[in-house]
Design a protein with these regions (language model features):
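Short pre-catalytic strand/loop immediately N-terminal to key active-site residues, enriched for Gly-Thr
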Residues: 183-196
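Conserved post-catalytic alpha-helical subdomain immediately downstream of the catalytic base
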Residues: 196, 205-248
Length: 273
């Protein structure tokens, strides 16, 4: 299943429109290239509808939010919906400020998303209207653990059913769920949290997988999350004592570039609930 999703991505090479943040935009573009797709990073309202129309998928990331890009996100999201293109939302820091939270809610009201990907604090904020987001990282009280995994899975399924989107909650244990099934994924390495933008890269990667597998968004999102986590493991195994987080970032992108569908299928560590 994951193998097929990755094979489709490599063979179809979709063009992915990213309205993302300027902290990680270069890494996101390189991640899209590494997986076999092509990126375009356009965020001016005068062209986003045109750009979205020629792309196979759209990735919306609110990491460096401003009033100009909010307009662009709404225009692009609605155009993608009209065309039936998959749309990914990364609600970076939702709950940390009124602007971020209000914008995330407006996007959810006005755009139908294929996948909503965030940490547990961000997703809980979207689901409940309140949260304890600490910057853009999950608050320590909101970690998904083996002890609370059943409850977290039930929460993810309920939110997915309510929104009609696949919900991807990423952390030490990742959950990717629709209203009926959930993938619990245990790939990755703790050092990934030392690299700014691994989540942003994952959202761009998810948009690429979804564009190449439009009829199977749950499996596409799960494949993206497994691939990113596996890349984190492979990259960490390459590090020498003199390497740090910048080298690790590059090795993660390299790992996706060099990853084969067979390697993903073999290395993915998940269960379905």
């Amino acid at each position: 299943m994951l193998k097929t999703a990755f094979e489709n991505l490599r063979s179809r090479s979709p063009l992915i429109h990213n309205i993302t943040n300027y902290v990680t935009v270069n890494d996101c573009a390189n991640m899209v290239l590494a997986c076999g797709a092509s990126p375009i990073m356009a965020d001016d309202a005068a062209e986003v509808e045109e750009i979205t129309a020629i792309c196979g998928g759209l990735n919306i990331n609110i990491g460096t939010l401003n009033s100009r890009t909010v307009t662009s996100m709404l225009l692009a999201g609605k155009k993608a919906n009209q065309l039936g293109h998959p749309v990914v939302l990364d609600p970076v820091g939702a709950g940390a400020s009124h602007l971020r939270t209000d914008t995330a809610f407006r996007l959810l009201r006005e755009v139908q998303f294929t996948v909503i990907r965030g940490n547990i604090s961000e997703i809980k904020t979207l689901a409940s209207g309140a949260g304890t987001t600490k910057g853009v990282d999950a608050d320590v009280a909101d970690k998904v653990t083996e002890e609370n995994l059943d409850n977290a899975v039930a929460f993810a399924k309920a939110f997915a059913a309510r929104t009609g989107a696949v919900v991807a909650i990423t952390g030490a244990i990742d959950i990717v769920a629709d209203g009926e099934r959930a993938f619990c994924i245990r790939n990755g390495h703790p050092m990934m949290s030392a690299v700014t933008g691994t989540g942003c890269q994952l959202s761009a990667l998810t948009a690429a997988f979804c564009a190449a597998n439009p009829d199977k968004p749950l499996e596409a999102a799960a494949a993206a999350v497994c691939a990113m986590g596996l890349a984190g493991e492979i990259a960490h195994a390459r590090l020498t004592p003199l390497d740090g987080n910048a080298t690790y970032r590059n090795y993660i992108i390299d790992a996706i570039y060099n990853m084969t569908p067979e390697q993903l299928e073999k290395g993915a560590n998940y269960e379905v609930r």
